[in-house]
């Protein structure tokens, strides 16, 4: 007799044969045989890799690929991280160097307090920054240079933004102002002579009307080459620094804040030559990345094949149940055929392949998108490590975490949705009421971060202590606000959240001792008592031949 497995497969695949099979009268023995075959097929599908090896001698290729992949992807990420670390360090050190170079009297950690308060100090700062720019080659200890535009070097743009008209008389409490903003700019060429005198003698041909002035911006470009990568057997990158020094007088409070912003872009060096073995090492790294791509491609194909087989078996089982039991399979039972771990591995493989391609482009200096590559490789590595948990879950002593998370997730999501409503209410209230009086409540983002820190018990005293006492009513409100938030979230909501997880954990432990509730699918499978090493599962591997040939006759 031919393998009955194919009967079910054939009937589930072709609607015409399904109708034929449904109408055909089969003997009770044949029906029992079909049920037995379906149970055995389902039981084999839900076996772990070791049991499948005992049942049919099938090698656990996906497990071997995942173990190999986790080692290779982790090594790749570490190597890329070390390279990216040099890029980040070079950016940060250059930004600090530029602040010391172009901001007069700048000291570290002065970004929030660096400001001037007199007109002469404003002109001093402007003249100092321009002079440092013109004397760059004489004052800078780095390999910085002006940007070349053809035969000329890029100029520094000095722009002031101010109200079109403004007559302000604070003594009389009167003003006349046109809020339209105008801009005036002029340029300073690096090769032009520049005479430095006193602020009264030389004001850069720039006259500032501080009553109307909003901002003054000095913008210029510099270039540099990151040579430290050579010591790590990597080709250097070329950097473009777009520097903007801003004198902010928008508040007109008598305090002009000064800041330096550094917009950095990495470019491929146009003409380079490095002696030694750097080129060879670069080729080795690209070969390694190519092998990672090949490994992930194999993993991707195997997992996609497994997902497709699961969906095919799902449809086959649904048709079988409808044909023999006149019942529809529940959605929860159907979802058991969709392996979420495989889907996660597929996503990680796709991210790794794309990230590895970008990494190879970066190493070849034809691409400089470090941030995108970091996100792709970092996310993929995280998912690869999480995917290994699936194989640990096949052991009863290791799958408690997985089962608890799966069981608790729906209730946790519902609970978090309710808690989020309360949390957002406190965020909006704290921002609008406490924002003018507390540094940690100046923006919605800062409010959310501050409240989340309070939930974790961090920085509580500082949050209370930094509240200004200029308004007694607001100060009293802040105490009620903070005490109620801490009491509500730490003692009630957080405790209920932990209790929700704990209750699920205890339930899972009890299930492990007394047995899990049987679904309709699991009950159907449990009637198959054949052990993996019984040899009966090997019969399912025969080529497919339909038993119901008479349907087509």
UniProtKB/Swiss-Prot annotation:
It is found in: Cell membrane; Early endosome membrane; Late endosome membrane; Lysosome membrane. Changing residue 459 to A: Decreases in Ca(2+) permeability and selectivity; decreases channel pore dynamic behavior. GO terms for biological process: calcium ion transmembrane transport; inner ear auditory receptor cell differentiation; locomotory behavior. The record marks 305 as: Interaction with phosphoinositides. Channel activity is activated by PtdIns(3,5)P2 (phosphatidylinositol 3,5-bisphosphate). Inhibited by lumenal H(+) and Na(+). The channel pore shows dynamic behavior and undergoes spontaneous, Ca(2+)-dependent modulation when conducting Ca(2+). One of its GO terms (cellular component) is early endosome membrane. PANTHER family: MUCOLIPIN, MUCOLIPIN-3. This is Mucolipin-3. It comes from Homo sapiens. The lineage of its organism: Eukaryota, Metazoa, Chordata, Craniata, Vertebrata.
């Amino acid at each position: 007799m031919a393998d009955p497995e194919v009967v079910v497969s054939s009937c589930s695949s072709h609607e015409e044969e399904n109708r034929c099979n449904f109408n055909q009268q089969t003997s009770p023995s044949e029906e029992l045989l079909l049920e037995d075959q379906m149970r055995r097929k389902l039981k084999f599908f839900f076996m772990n890799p070791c049991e499948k090896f005992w049942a049919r001698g099938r090698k656990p290729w996906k497990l071997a690929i995942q173990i190999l992949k986790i080692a290779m992807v982790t090594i790749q990420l570490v190597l890329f991280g070390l390279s990216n670390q040099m890029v980040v360090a070079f950016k940060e050190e250059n930004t600090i160097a530029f602040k010391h170079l172009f901001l007069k009297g700048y000291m570290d950690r002065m970004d929030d307090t660096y400001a001037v308060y007199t007109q002469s100090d404003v002109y001093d700062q402007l003249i100092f920054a321009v002079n440092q720019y013109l004397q760059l080659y004489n004052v800078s200890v780095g390999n910085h240079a002006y940007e070349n535009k053809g035969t000329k070097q890029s100029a520094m743009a000095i722009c002031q933004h101010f109200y079109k008209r403004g007559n302000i008389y604070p003594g009389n409490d009167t003003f006349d102002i046109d809020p339209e903003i105008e801009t005036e700019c002029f340029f300073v060429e690096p090769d032009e002579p520049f005479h430095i005198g006193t602020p009264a003698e030389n004001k850069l041909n720039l006259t500032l009307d501080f009553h109307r002035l909003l901002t003054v911006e000095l913008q210029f470009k510099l270039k540099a080459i990151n040579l430290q990568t050579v010591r790590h057997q990597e080709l250097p990158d070329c950097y473009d620094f777009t520097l903007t020094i801003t004198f902010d007088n928008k508040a007109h409070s008598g305090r002009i804040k000064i800041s330096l912003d550094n917009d950095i872009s990495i470019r491929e060096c146009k003409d380079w030559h490095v002696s030694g073995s750097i080129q060879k090492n670069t080729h080795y790294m690209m070969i390694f990345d190519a092998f990672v791509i090949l490994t992930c491609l194999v993993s991707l194909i195997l997992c996609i094949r497994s997902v497709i087989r699961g969906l095919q078996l799902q449809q086959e089982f649904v048709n079988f149940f409808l044909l023999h039991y006149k019942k529809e399979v529940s959605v929860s039972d159907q979802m058991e055929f969709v392996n979420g771990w495989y889907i996660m591995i597929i996503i990680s493989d796709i991210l790794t392949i794309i990230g590895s391609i970008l990494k190879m482009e970066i190493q070849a200096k034809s691409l400089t998108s470090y941030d995108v590559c970091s996100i792709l490789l970092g996310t993929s590595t995280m998912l690869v490590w999480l995917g290994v948990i699936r194989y640990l879950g096949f052991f009863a002593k290791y799958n408690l975490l997985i089962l608890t998370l799966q069981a608790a997730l729906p209730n946790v999501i519902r609970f978090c949705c309710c808690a989020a409503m309360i949390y957002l209410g406190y965020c909006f209230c704290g921002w609008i009421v406490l924002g003018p009086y507390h540094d940690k409540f100046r923006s919605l983002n800062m409010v959310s971060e501050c409240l989340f820190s309070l939930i974790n018990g961090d920085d509580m005293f500082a949050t209370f202590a930094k509240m200004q006492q200029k308004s007694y009513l607001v100060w009293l409100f802040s105490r009620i606000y903070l005490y109620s938030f801490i009491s509500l979230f730490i003692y009630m909501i957080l405790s209920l959240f932990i209790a929700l997880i704990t209750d699920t954990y205890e339930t899972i432990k009890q299930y492990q001792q007394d047995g899990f509730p049987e679904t309709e699918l699991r009950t159907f499978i449990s009637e198959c008592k054949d052990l993996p090493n019984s040899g009966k599962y090997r019969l399912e591997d025969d080529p497919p031949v339909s038993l119901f040939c008479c349907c087509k006759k």
